[in-house]
Design a protein with these regions (language model features):
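Short glycine/proline- and aromatic-enriched beta-strand/turn motifs that initiate or cap beta-hairpins
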Residues: 25-67, 243-245, 255
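Extracellular/periplasm-exposed beta-strand and loop segments of Gram-negative cell-envelope proteins
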Residues: 45-57, 89-121, 151-187, 218-235
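Transmembrane beta-barrel architecture of outer-membrane proteins
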Residues: 57-63, 79, 118-124, 139-141, ...
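Predominantly the C-terminal beta-signal and adjacent terminal strand-loop region
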Residues: 89, 187, 192-255
Length: 255
């Protein structure tokens, strides 16, 4: 239901942008295009069912951003934003005893550590609303929309042999994920976030944003014959972006 609602919101804004010249008497017409690049950090995990104890997996993201601003309706600046990002996501297991103490491997003498790194090409499309200055100064914004991801590759980091794990001291005995490769190469979900933008007419736009993504698909099969009933990605992104204007609305009253 949430996915349908987000799609309706995005379609409504896209239709609004395409019809903006015909509705200039309702809102203040804009036709502005900006292009740029950004990057940041990604904190991610996988929602396994049965549950796998985890801490946040740390990764990086970088990519291109395209923004089309179509209208200012009362105080809200309406835009559509599309991105293409290279993102490092995954999960990092929290291998503990019942006393919440890290499990020590009896062979290596080291605390057992397991991490799966997965690389995706992520493509979100956002409906964006902003409030504040457009040409010079600060603007707060909120954006939400669908996101798809294309799986590129994966890598495992572990400091013990799975057959020689210290199973006796582990709280969780779920290890199926440790030997399974990604089965579903296409990911999809809903992303949304908020941030602050600073604009200068001769320099461009600088954006700082926090974003959350919730995957609606699974990386593994989820039928009755499969081990996991759910295995969806979720992540938090902290991102900096720079945009420069390709096209501006010819209106000296825009501040």
């Amino acid at each position: 239901m949430a996915g349908k609602g987000m799609r309706k919101l995005l379609v409504a804004l896209l239709l609004g942008c395409s019809a903006a010249p015909l509705m200039a008497q309702v809102g203040q017409y804009r036709s502005e295009l900006a292009l740029g690049a950004g990057g940041g950090v990604v904190l991610s995990n996988v929602g396994f069912m049965p549950k796998v104890p985890q801490t946040m997996h740390n990764g990086m993201t970088a990519g291109l951003t395209l923004r089309y601003t179509c209208e200012k309706y009362f105080s809200s600046i309406c835009a559509v934003v599309a991105e293409m990002n290279y993102a490092q996501v995954g999960w990092k297991e929290d291998i503990l005893t019942p006393e919440d103490v890290p499990v020590v491997n009896k062979v290596t003498g080291l605390t057992e550590q397991y991490q799966r790194d997965m690389t995706y090409l992520q493509i979100p499309v956002f409906a964006r609303l902003g409030w504040g200055r457009e040409r010079r100064g600060f603007q707060a914004f909120f954006q939400v929309g669908p996101q798809v991801g294309i799986f590129l590759n994966e890598k495992t980091k572990m400091n013990f042999d799975l057959a020689q794990r210290n199973a006796a001291q582990r709280t969780s005995q779920i290890i199926a994920q440790d030997t399974m490769g990604v089965e579903h190469k296409f990911d999809y979900g809903i992303a949304g976030g908020a941030g602050l933008e600073f604009s200068h007419p001769k320099v461009g736009h600088f954006l700082l944003e926090g974003r959350y993504y919730y995957g609606l698909g699974d990386i593994y099969g989820n039928s009755k014959k499969d081990f996991f009933g759910r295995s969806n990605l979720s992540n938090i992104v902290i991102k900096l972006t720079y945009l420069f204007d390709l096209k501006k609305t010819n209106n000296s009253k825009i501040k």
